[in-house]
A protein has these predicted regions:
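Short glycine/proline-enriched turns and hinge-like loops at secondary-structure junctions
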Residues: 19-20, 150
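Conserved core of the sugar-phosphate nucleotidyltransferase
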Residues: 118-150
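Conserved beta-strand scaffold positions in the cores of enzyme catalytic domains, especially
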Residues: 28, 77, 138-140
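Conserved N-terminal catalytic core of the sugar/cofactor nucleotidyltransferase
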Residues: 1-7, 15-18, 30-110, 116-120, ...
Length: 150
């Protein structure tokens, strides 16, 4: 079954102020010294997803196209009709991909996490994809919590 990556990158730039602003939200920052966060997320999906989509808001779509030039086709940059957070973002991507490609596996990642072990993360994604294929179920991955937090 084909695997499509989805990068959630619609944040408004409010959580990492003053580095991140509404004019330059976190996903467009280069915090590692290598790439912008959104491009690192796209790269993280390589070897797992055959194609990658980015969900962003309409006001950031042009900058997203510029920032991801050559990595993601223009029609793979999805503009959220309204900012409604994670569930709506994933639902919008799922409906768009379902209409275009039918029943596939979607691998959804945020644009802004720090990932120390890129290859280990990629292997975890591959295991999750295999589990989804095998069980025809929703698979989630995450870190084991060590304390309660929001």
């Amino acid at each position: 079954m084909k695997v499509y990556g989805v990068v959630m990158a619609g944040g408004g730039g409010t959580r990492l102020w003053p580095l991140s602003t509404s004019r330059k939200p976190k996903q467009f920052l280069n915090l590692s010294g290598k790439e912008t966060l959104v491009n690192e997320a796209i790269d993280r999906l390589s070897g797992v997803a055959q194609e990658t989509f980015i969900v962003t808001n309409a006001s950031q779509a042009q900058e997203m196209l510029s920032q991801t030039a050559g990595r993601v086709p223009e029609d793979h940059i999805l503009k959220e009709p309204a900012a409604r957070n994670t569930a709506a973002c994933i639902g919008y991507a799922a409906m768009t991909i379902l209409k275009k490609y039918g029943d596939v596996i979607m691998c959804v990642v945020p644009s802004d996490p720090y990932t120390r072990d890129e290859e280990g993360f990629r292997q975890t994604l591959k295991s999750a994809v295999a589990a989804a294929e095998e069980t025809d179920a929703l698979v989630t991955i995450g870190i084991r919590p060590t304390f309660p937090s929001t």
